[in-house]
Design a protein with these regions (language model features):
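Conserved phosphate-binding catalytic cores of ATP/NTP-utilizing and phosphoryl-transfer enzymes
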Residues: 1-2, 110-134, 315-316
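N-terminal beta-alpha supersecondary unit
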Residues: 4-83, 112, 116
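Short Gly/Thr/Asp-enriched flexible loops that form oxyanion-binding sites at enzyme active sites
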Residues: 79-103, 122-123, 280-289
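Short beta-strand scaffold segments in enzyme catalytic cores
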Residues: 16-21, 136, 144-148
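Glycine-rich phosphate-binding/hydrolytic loop that grips phosphoryl groups
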Residues: 116, 300-338
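Glycine-rich phosphate-binding loop plus the immediately following alpha-helix
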Residues: 150-193, 217-226
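A contiguous, well-structured pocket-lining segment that forms one wall/lid of small-molecule binding clefts
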Residues: 189-270, 279-293, 320-323
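Conserved phosphate-binding/catalytic loops in two-lobed NTP-binding clefts
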Residues: 109-110, 270, 287-312
Length: 338
């Protein structure tokens, strides 16, 4: 019996992506990132859904072509049902349902956040994946959480942000600095030439493992406004130091809670996932903890950090193996709990 070939489709925000997987190995992973939102300083939902409609067919076609797969060879179709922007999700969901119906193959819904975590089980991403149980710090523009992963689909959120996500904080602070959207990668790059101890910003004090990032943003805003009154060129003259200091503050905040969870639970299998897991400072601090605290760490390949269909296909394969299929009458949902 031939190994199943799964097509994965991702459209939760502003990335239209399709991927093909077989035996946990990615045969193709194509993405079209929408740049139209840059001028607006954030994702515009209506524009995003329209762009998905234009992009989804060519992206899927390119994914199949790169994998050297014909449509009739597809065993099942996995798609992001949520969470995310409803209009964007509906495009991917409708396309996946239509294609599954026309090919008479199973449809498999995928939770976008679970997919970020389970991307660690893609073979080419990590030939030696995490052992259960493990902790995963999942950080993106829309979510920040610490997840206790007991099994593939046995996950518990033990800590999460009560306001802004870490990626959202990077973007909002980037706007204060006059940087383009999305600002996370720009701040990371500028921080390479800056002093992370140049400026000190307020850090939230919360019990347990929960996060808060809105206070950091406010602290930066008030500090910059005060300095600009003294020197109108303050941001331009200190941009690298500002970026390095902000990055250190956010990463320290992320790691403090993760370190607490590791200590309290006694679990030293530790992973990171999501778009912010591409941040160089976060990766460096994770590596430092591996060396000093004896953590066994798992850091995703860069192509699996941002929204991508490879992780959707990975989860779909796991569900296919378990015989967990989705009714064709299903629809997308902007909120989708584990």
């Amino acid at each position: 019996m031939n190994a199943p070939i799964i097509l994965g489709i991702e459209s939760s925000c502003d990335d239209t992506s399709a991927a093909v997987i077989r035996e946990r190995k990615i045969l193709s992973n194509i993405a079209n990132t929408q740049t139209i939102h840059n001028e607006y300083g954030g994702v515009v939902p209506e524009l995003a859904s329209r762009a998905h409609q234009q992009n989804i067919i060519p992206v899927v076609q390119k994914s199949l072509a790169e994998a050297k797969i014909q449509q009739n060879e597809i065993s099942a179709i996995g798609f992001t049902r949520g969470p995310g922007l409803l209009g964007s999700l509906l495009v991917g969901t409708s396309f996946a349902k239509s294609l599954a119906m026309s090919l008479d193959v199973p449809l498999i819904e995928v939770n976008h956040l679970q997919a970020h975590i389970l991307a660690h089980f893609i073979y080419d991403a990590n030939p030696t994946p995490p052992q259960f149980p493990f902790l995963c710090l999942t950080v993106s523009g829309g979510h920040t959480m610490i997840v206790l992963v007991r099994d593939y689909f046995d996950m518990e959120i033990i800590g999460k942000t009560i306001d802004d996500a870490a990626g959202e904080a990077f973007d909002k602070i980037g706007k204060i600095f006059g940087l383009d959207y999305p600002a996370g990668a720009i701040i990371d790059k500028l921080a390479q030439n800056g002093n992370p101890d140049a400026f000190t910003f307020g850090k939230p004090k919360l019990e347990g493992y929960d996060y808060s990032f809105s206070g950091i943003k406010t602290s930066v805003l008030y500090f910059v406004q005060k300095e600009l009154q003294k020197n109108p060129n303050f941001i331009r003259e200190n941009l690298s130091d500002l970026c390095a200091s902000v990055q250190k503050t956010i990463v320290d905040t992320l790691m403090n809670k993760l370190q607490k969870a590791v200590k309290d639970l006694g679990i030293k299998e530790v992973a990171i996932a999501g778009g912010v897991s591409a941040n160089s400072e976060l990766r460096k601090v994770m590596q430092s903890n591996a060396e000093k605290q004896g953590w066994n760490i798992f850091i995703p390949k860069f192509e699996y950090t941002t929204d991508n269909a490879a992780m959707i296909a990975m989860v779909a394969q796991l569900k296919y193996e378990r015989g967990e299929f989705t009714d064709l009458r299903t629809t997308a949902t902007s909120r989708y709990d584990f």
